[in-house]
Amino acid sequence: MQNSHSGVNQLGGVFVNGRPLPDSTRQKIVELAHSGARPCDISRILQVSNGCVSKILGRYYETGSIRPRAIGGSKPRVATPEVVSKIAQYKRECPSIFAWEIRDRLLSEGVCTNDNIPSVSSINRVLRNLASEKQQMGADGMYDKLRMLNGQTGSWGTRPGWYPGTSVPGQPTQDGCQQQEGGGENTNSISSNGEDSDEAQMRLQLKRKLQRNRTSFTQEQIEALEKEFERTHYPDVFARERLAAKIDLPEARIQVWFSNRRAKWRREEKLRNQRRQASNTPSHIPISSSFSTSVYQPIPQPTTPVSSFTSGSMLGRTDTALTNTYSALPPMPSFTMANNLPMQPPVPSQTSSYSCMLPTSPSVNGRSYDTYTPPHMQTHMNSQPMGTSGATSTGLISPGVSVPVQVPGSEPDMSQYWPRLQ
C-alpha cells in the first residue's frame, strides 16, 4: 500500500484512491469505538477521515459486519419482489411502522440475511413507491368514473345507475378488510418482535447511541455555561473538563454548546452593528432642510456700508466723458421703480452680478471694481439708497448669474461697452 498509494488525506494518512480500507484498520476502528472513543478521536488516532470512520461504524452497528461492500459494477438488487411484498405486508399490518423496524423484522423472520438486507433508505424508497402506486390507482378509478359520467348521454335519472359499477365506492370496503387484517396481524407482529435475537437487540442499542439526541440543559447548567462564556468564548480543554465536572455534563456537549453560543453571539453582534449604523445615519443627512440649503440660500445682511444707484447718476464719477455717455443713454425705468418692492441687499463679494472691472486711470480718482445690474434684473432694485454712506462710488445689483466682464482702462473707448451692458 505504501508503494501504490495515490494521495494523502488531511490528517496525514495515506489512502489508495477507489479502494476500501484494509481489514486491520477497520478492526481497529471497531475496537476503539467499543472502548469508548469518539469517531473524531478515532479519526485523529488512525489518520482516517471522519466520514470514513462514521460510515464504517454505522454499517457495523446496522449489520454487524465490517467488510466493505462490492466495488465496481452494479450492486446486486436487494429489494427483490419477495422482499417488496413482505415490506408491503408489514406496512399494511402496522401503517405507523418505521423503516428500521421493518429492517429488523426482515432479519428476525429470516427473510433476509446480513449480506442481502436492504438499507433503511432502500426500504423508505420501496414504501414511497408503494404509496405512489396506491395513489395512482385511486386517481385512475376517479378518472374512470369521470370518463363514464362524461360519456353518458341519457337523462339525469339514468346517471345514478353508473355509481354502483365504479371502483371508488368499493375502496372503503377494501380498506375495511385491510384494517381488519391489520388488526388481526398486529398481535403477530408484537410476538415476532418479542422473539428478536439478542444480537439484533445489542446492535439496535448501539445504533441508538450513535444517533444524536438534543441535550436539554437545566437552569443551573445554563447559568454556569453563560458565566464561563462571559469570561472567554474559547475555553481550553482544562476549563471544559472543570465545567463538565461541575455541572455534570460530557465535555463534548460543552464543546458543542460553546460552538453554538459563539454562532449566536456573532448573529447578535451583526444585528447590533446594523442597528447602530441605522441610528447614526439620519444625523449626517438632514432631510427637512435639504431643499432650502441646496437651491435657495438666504442672503445675509452686509457687514459693511454699501452704496447703490440713485436716480441722478449711475456711476459717481466726475469724468465728463462718462457723464456724457450716460446722459446719452435712454432712461431706464429701473431707476424710478416703486418703493413698495422688498429688497435684500446682497454682499458685494458674492458672484451674483456682472463685474465691470474698470482699472484706475489718471483722470479717475480712487476708481476700483464696479458692479452693474443688467436691465432684466432691475425689477428687484429700489430707487432709494441702500447704504448708509454718502459717497456714491459703487452700484449694486440683485442676485443672479454672474459673468465677469473686463473693460479696458482707456477712458475714450469706454462708450462702446455701455450698449453691450444694457
From Swiss-Prot:
Region: PAI subdomain, residue numbers: 7-63
GO biological process: brain development; forebrain development; negative regulation of neurogenesis; negative regulation of transcription by RNA polymerase II; positive regulation of DNA-templated transcription; regulation of transcription by RNA polymerase II; retina development in camera-type eye; sensory organ development
Any GO MF annotation of the entry: transcription cis-regulatory region binding
Function per UniProt: Transcription factor with important functions in the development of the eye, nose, central nervous system and pancreas. Required for the differentiation of pancreatic islet alpha cells. Competes with PAX4 in binding to a common element in the glucagon, insulin and somatostatin promoters. Regulates specification of the ventral neuron subtypes by establishing the correct progenitor domains. Acts as a transcriptional repressor of NFATC1-mediated gene expression.
UniProt-annotated stretches for the region Disordered: 162-201, 269-311
Highest taxon, organism lineage: Eukaryota
Subcellular location(s) of the protein: Nucleus
Alphabetized UniProt keyword annotations: Developmental protein, Differentiation, DNA-binding, Homeobox, Nucleus, Paired box, Transcription, Transcription regulation, Ubl conjugation
Stated name of the protein: Paired box protein Pax-6
Post-translational note: Ubiquitinated by TRIM11, leading to ubiquitination and proteasomal degradation.
Transmembrane segment boundaries: none
Pfam families named in the record: Homeodomain (PF00046), PAX (PF00292)
Biased composition (Low complexity): 281-294
Region feature Required for suppression of NFATC1-mediated transcription, mapped onto this chain: 345-422
DNA-binding interval(s): 4-130, 210-269
